[in-house]
Each structure stands twice: as structure tokens, then as C-alpha cells.
Amino acid sequence: MRKGLIALIALIAICITIGAASAADWSFNIGSDTNSDGGSVQINNNELKIQDEKFTIPDGYKENESARDVGADGKGNFEGAKVSVCELKKGNETILIKVFFADGGIHNITAPANSENKTIGGHDGFLITDDGLFTFDYGVNEKVVEIVASNESAIEAVLK
């Protein structure tokens, strides 16, 4: 009887060890800087890094942490891609920065009909002005960056 109890305890200990080792490869930290889908968002002082693309956080802006999204399913023009998002706020002003990425990369970006070709911060892309918002999209390193702000100068500040 005693040998059977010891064997049962040993078997349970082995199962727990195997289960813990298997779970080590999974990320259970929802809202963390990285996740198992490959998404990443990091902030260090006034530098924001999303999917290894660097941005400047303009003076006075702070992250709205509840709006952070890491490796979520992309929608709209980038269906099938993942997206990591960071929202910066200063009073009533908001800057939304999204980086879309996919396993095979994103290679073709089509300019929307209502956009104009524009170079901001050294990046060639497309600027859309609609209902008081400015949206700038550009491709970099097989990813697509989208920045939405209430004015073009805020986009320029992010891309310095």
C-alpha cells in the first residue's frame, strides 16, 4: 500500500513538472509588452518602439495604457495581418500609432482614392485628411505604419 502511494505521488509530481515545462513557452500576460503572436510595444522615456519601429513621444503626451493592443488581428485594408497599437494623449489631443505586420511581410500598399502622396519624417507614404483627422500610412521593413492625429505637425513630431 505504501509503495503504491509513493508511486502515485511521484507520478503526480512528474505530471506537474511536465505541465509547467510545457506552459513555459506560452505567454499568459495579457497587456504585456510582448505576446506569443509576435507583437511588441515598448516605451523608454520619450521613445516608443512598436514591432522594432521607433517613434518619438512628443513633449506632454502620455500613453493611454488601456488602449494598448499587442499582436491583435488586423482589420480593414490589412486583413490577415496582426497589429500592435499605442495611443498617446495630451489633454484633448490624441495620437494613435499602429504597426501592421504579417508572417510573410506586407509588400504592397495601395493609396486610397482620397489620399495624397506625402513625405513626412523621411517616410514616403499617403496622407488622408478626413473630418479633422490626419492619417499617414507608409511601408517600412515589410510592415505598414499608420499614424492618426488631429494635425500634421503631431505626425511630424512622432517621426522625428
What does each model-found stretch correspond to?
Residues M1-F28:
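Secretory targeting signatures
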Residues G4-A10, E47, E87, V158:
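Acidic/proline-rich low-complexity IDRs
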Residues T17-S22, Q51, I57-P58, Y138:
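Generic detector of short, well-ordered, non-transmembrane alpha-helical segments enriched
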Residues D33-D131:
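Short, solvent-exposed recognition patches
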Residues E116-K160:
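A short, solvent-exposed beta-edge/loop patch
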